[in-house]
C-alpha cells in the first residue's frame, strides 16, 4: 500500500501542473461517470473493462493483471492495441517513467487521442440494451 500511494503521488506531481483537470484516484466507485469524463484511461484489462472502454470510445493504456492461467487480460488488451485504440505496458515493465512517457505520447497529441477513442468505439457491441431485454423476455416466458 505505501508503494502504491508513493507511485500515485509521483504521477500526480508530474501531471497536476502540466495538464488541466488531471485526477489521480486510488479507487473509483462511480466508474461509468469517470470513464465518460476522462480523456485517457489507465487501467487493467478485464473483459468488462474492454467492453466499457469500447462503448464510451476512450483511448487506454492497459496494464494487464498478470495471471497464471493463459494471460487473459493481456489477450483482452491486445484486441484494442491491434486496432490502434490502446497501448499496453506489461505489469513487469511498469515504471513511473514508462507510464509517464506513454501518457505523454497520447495525451499531448490531441489528434491521436481523438482517433484512438474513435477506433475503440468501432468494436463496441451494438444494441446491448435490446439484446438484454429480449433475453429477459425469453427467460420470463
Q: Where would I find each of the regions flagged by the language model?
A:
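Single conserved hydrophobic/aromatic residue that forms the stacking wall/gate
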Residues: 1-13
